[in-house]
Amino acid sequence: MGAAEAKAAILANKTALGIEFGSTRIKAVLVDDKNQPIASGGHEWENRYENGVWTYSLDDIWTGIQDCYQDMARDVKAKYDIELESVGAFGVSAMMHGYMPFNKKGELLVPFRTWRNNITGEASEKLMELFNYNIPQRWSIAHLYQAILNGEEHVKDIDYITTLEAYVHWKLTGKRVLGIGDAAGMFPIDTTKADYNQEMVDKFDELVAPYGFSWKLRDIMPKALVAGEDAGVLTEEGAKLLDVTGKLKAGIPMCPPEGDAGTGMVATNSVAVRTGNVSAGTSVFAMIVLEKELSRPYKEIDMVTTPSGHLVAMAHSNNCTSDLNAWVNVFKEFAEAMGMEVDMNKLFGTLYNKALEGDPDCGGLLSYCYFSGEHMTGFEEGRPLFVRSPESKFNLANFMRTNLYTCLGAMRVGLNLLFEKENVKVDRLLGHGGLFKTKGVGQQILADAVNAPVSVMATAGEGGAWGIALLASYLVNKEEGETLESFLDNKVFADQESSTLDPKPEGVAGFNVFMDSYMKGLSIERAAVESEIW
């Protein structure tokens, strides 16, 4: 779209704005009536580790979103010579989970406890037993119950507990609501009713009844909403809070606030049943939209939902490309020592493509990329390891193939539960992140690892801020009865270029051989962690 059309869309209020709080960056994306980005803004921020808790202050949150909005407004002014006064629709998203408890006066009772905190182990275990459902430590209900078990004073004064994006939305609209994708990161969801699981709500209320709190669980959680539902409008107070210059007008329709997993699914068009996406960078996770509930809970699998309320299984691994990148840097140092100019893109491309020349089973080589602990395989700490036998075929191609395979090893442990024990079917996966930057390499290896076609979009996309802008657009632009899946297929991604690679039988067989060695070799990783060398 040209500048003139974009300007016309802004003046006619045929735009949608999305703002997402990532862990290190707050990003704003403004889209036009074709759902394409026409302006953006950003603000860098960092979490703090205070009194044993990973947190962001309320001041960080508000100065951050204000600066991000101003940066986007400046972009609009620079590109189109317009002072931004309104948008057609607006949505806020953020890192999921965590714990923000407020009292009746709207005061935060303890500092925001983010998803990064692993301080709710006891509560997580007890709730999993009570509900017969996996309750990860970062979920809001685990934080609440741990605070109760700890005897924390603030619990008796709670009037509202919420997540980051629902907190911001509450202050902008006055509405205590949350998109179902992150509502599912607070408390288990009954997908047949698109609401919290009432049987489990009752069990929790019964569990904490002896403490004599004045509240019941449902009263203090945000109402769960699905994509496209009315979530209120930007109030006068909210407009002033967001735009400190006072130019932004109130009354803008707002979509349900949503978590970053949900916006990531939207931005990769992975919201339909039997589709999924794999994000592979420093960490790696797969999210697969399920046809039905799993037969039982698994500690390795997190259950969330799409913004429409379809059940999603998430297999998350803490470790992916850090060790691989470290090896690539060793080759960079070698090249520089030989007096060569090193282009990092060319170096990555050369080494990644070399991997495709390796034996499908990596010639008997084995690697663990555990920079940190890995819950999928039961490690609190990690040690990056490369191991081989004297008989292994040790060459550059097999070495690189091994280092790429192991990036997906821990995630595959979780996926095995879904594919083998639960018979989950996937028609298409979409890959995004650094592992897929070199055309056709990470993509082929993932296809072989999961034995399913893998697509990669020609453009990396705009990420979660674009995803929440699309959810805002869906709120105001959907036809009567139009599903989110249909809206994305027909009005957002219809012309999106992508390439798809099918799994190769020899690659699938080779990855399975590698995984057999990977599982058998975990005792080597255990010995490295328990040794007193590092």
Model-predicted segments: where are they?
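A sequence-level detector of short linear motifs
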Residues: 39-40, 110, 178, 313
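Intrinsically disordered, low-complexity sequence elements enriched in Ser/Thr/Gly/Pro
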Residues: 23-25, 114, 136, 301
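Active-site core segments that coordinate phosphate-bearing ligands/cofactors
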Residues: 3-11, 17-18, 121-178, 187-214, ...
